[in-house]
From Swiss-Prot:
GO cellular component: cytosolic small ribosomal subunit
Pfam families associated with the record: Ribosomal_S9
Record-given protein name: Small ribosomal subunit protein uS9
Keyword Ribosomal protein tagged: yes
Native organism: Ectopseudomonas mendocina (strain ymp)
Lineage, top ranks: Bacteria, Pseudomonadati, Pseudomonadota, Gammaproteobacteria, Pseudomonadales
InterPro entries: Ribosomal_Su5_D2-typ_SF, Ribosomal_uS9, Ribosomal_uS9_bac/plastid, Ribosomal_uS9_CS, Ribsml_uS5_D2-typ_fold_subgr
Gene3D superfamilies reported in the protein's UniProt record: 3.30.230.10
GO molecular function: RNA binding; structural constituent of ribosome
Length: 130
């Protein structure tokens, strides 16, 4: 079974996605739900499909994903990263176009911590001169 399946782990913000690529017809299953029912936002669905559309493998694979943590945007980004890594494991020649599109690099931006004496990470209380 391992010969017919490719795996990739994707991360974004606090979300982690485990992605399995199997030969198929283009079904995308996330946490045992379809892509359309899992993501209400069209932008999130579009982000998930980006690496497949770039490599023209949309109808070639069935994708099974388990994703935990984060919110809608983080989970979509994590799935995209995982699909990219699984595609590279499937065919190393896809690395170059995926790298050019910026899908291979893990987006390292994280939420900045809240500081003591501030309302948020950088928002300060109003300053009064007198």
């Amino acid at each position: 079974m391992s010969a017919t399946q490719n795996y990739g782990t994707g991360r974004r913000k606090t979300a982690t996605a485990r992605v399995f690529l199997r030969p198929g017809t283009g079904n995308i299953s996330i946490n045992n739900r379809s892509l359309d029912t899992f993501f209400g936002r069209e932008t999130a669905r579009m982000v998930v499909r980006q690496p497949l559309e770039l490599t023209e493998t949309t109808e070639k694979f069935d994708i099974y994903v388990t994703v935990i943590g984060g919110g809608v945007s983080g989970q979509a980004g994590a799935i995209r990263h995982g699909i990219t890594r699984a595609l590279i494991e499937y065919d190393e020649t896809l690395r170059s176009p995926l790298r050019k599109a910026g899908y291979v690099t893990r987006d390292a931006r994280e939420v900045e911590r809240k500081k003591v004496g501030l309302r948020k990470a950088r928002k300060r209380p109003q300053y009064s001169k007198r």
